[in-house]
């Protein structure tokens, strides 16, 4: 039996089912998952739950064996609240550059560009 303290291998991870966060990379594009972007080797994993909002899946996660790929700070916050358990894996995620999600019509709007710059500056200070 595998120890809970040893990181899970990709082979072992692929035996489990995922709760996947889905999103579109651009308007009209097919949905992709955070799992597929962060861990390309896990692309073939079984998805038992797909959602566009990870918060809606948290209660399901806490009462199931589903695995969900989340940003580290989000996972830490949910784990500290006792809502999820963090499972270490041998695979390392692809480094992601954070992006703000904006509707394509507001992308060039000067006021929205200013709002994004304020958010970006604030995020760099923390």
Per-range role (PLM):
Residues 4, 20-21, 85-126:
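A late-sequence structural motif
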Residues 14-15, 62-64, 94-96:
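Residue-level preference for short coil/turn positions at secondary-structure junctions
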Residues 13, 19-21, 66-67, 78:
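Conserved short hydrophobic patches within well-ordered secondary structure
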Residues 10-11, 39, 76, 90-92:
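Short secondary-structure boundary/capping segments
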Residues 24-26, 67-74, 95-104:
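Short secondary-structure transition/capping segments
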């Amino acid at each position: 039996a595998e120890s809970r303290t040893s990181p899970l291998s990709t082979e072992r991870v692929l035996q489990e089912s995922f709760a996947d966060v889905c999103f579109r990379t651009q308007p009209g594009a097919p949905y992709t998952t955070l799992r597929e972007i962060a861990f390309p080797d896990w692309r073939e994993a079984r998805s038992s739950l797909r959602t566009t909002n990870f918060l809606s899946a948290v209660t399901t996660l806490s009462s199931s064996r589903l695995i969900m790929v989340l940003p580290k700070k989000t996972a830490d916050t949910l784990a500290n609240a006792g809502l999820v358990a963090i499972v270490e894996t041998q695979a390392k995620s692809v480094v992601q550059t954070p992006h703000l999600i904006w509707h394509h019509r507001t992308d060039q709007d000067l006021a929205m560009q200013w709002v994004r710059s304020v958010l970006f500056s604030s995020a760099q200070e923390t």
